[in-house]
Amino acid sequence: MPPDPQTVAALGEFALIDRLATALAEVGAAAAPDLLGIGDDAAIWMPTPGTRAVITTDSLIARIHFRLDWTSWRDLGHKALATNLSDVAAMGARPRVATVSLALTGAEPIAGLLDLYRGLGTLAAAHGVVVAGGDIVASPERLGLHLTVVGESWPDFDGRLLTRDRARPGDLLVVSGPLGRSAAGLETLLRSSIVGRRSSVSDRSAGKSLASASPDLSGDRRPTTDDFLVAHHRPTPQIAYGRAIVAAGGRVAMDLSDGLFGDLAKICARSGVGAIVEEGALPVPDAVRAAFPDEWLRLATRGGEDYELLFTADVATMDRLRDLCVARDLPAPAIIGIITAPPAIAPPIRLRRIDGREEPVGGGAFDHFAGG
């Protein structure tokens, strides 16, 4: 039986590459004066003199990291790149070049893959990133996306970057924005078994930059399903915030991909410190609290995929950062706790409840190979 003429198997690898390159060019993500991209054996890029390179890689596998009955191809492309850009933001760097490799079964619709590239290309162009190439291979069972992003330190900071290993007792523990939004979206999908809603979110945003799409979770109105789905499907990489943290003199940051407690545990381990998190200081939107009155704390601390920045700062750095946030129209940072000396008995993180009780909490970051 011949393959469906609208699928990859019928079009072929090299014709698909040409179509994908055209899709990137249409959204302005395929060329730059300092880069030789798609069409050669390797890309050539000229980094800015005096900067330090930052490299990150992520893979997304169907039915492990995403479900195409829950998300559109365009949203999948956006999120696949956004997770990599978020890693660069967490280093206090700027992304410059991306490569995308696809593992395809052959049954993927051509129109879907073009939309995937339009989604990631639109986000790339919004942040000055060029998609410089990649690879296409056959996959016998399921779709896989593998992205690498190369960035560089901002030229005006003498190569300074943010890492996880320089937190000190007495530092304030801070996040760049609200927690629990993406987990609320995933919980909505899991509870509702929404199938077919994937197009509704994308269609309502047609003609808008995906990079700027964001839900209204201010609490001024009742939350809607789409509010949470947008937060889950289209995270915003906090590149400008990472730059502001470096400018203010910050040293430590990471992005919140595996949940607050899980990611904070990584900072504690790398820096050899402990931490106290204040329940009453967690910036959880009213809409999340209203929709999940018994579970908002779990969503905010263990849900993951918020892609806000978690960082530490001394008082002087925080004062400078607040001023920079006002000047650059960035959200005010939220202080959620303090870094402490490592406790004598593990775990290193304690949650101070509203009533003043302190509870030890485990990290519990997502583990691809954990049982259960």
Question: What positions do the PLM features span?
Answer:
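Glycine-/charge-enriched secondary-structure boundary and capping motifs
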Residues: 1-28, 51, 71, 107-132, ...
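Glycine-rich anion-binding loops of enzyme active sites
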Residues: 60, 96-190, 338
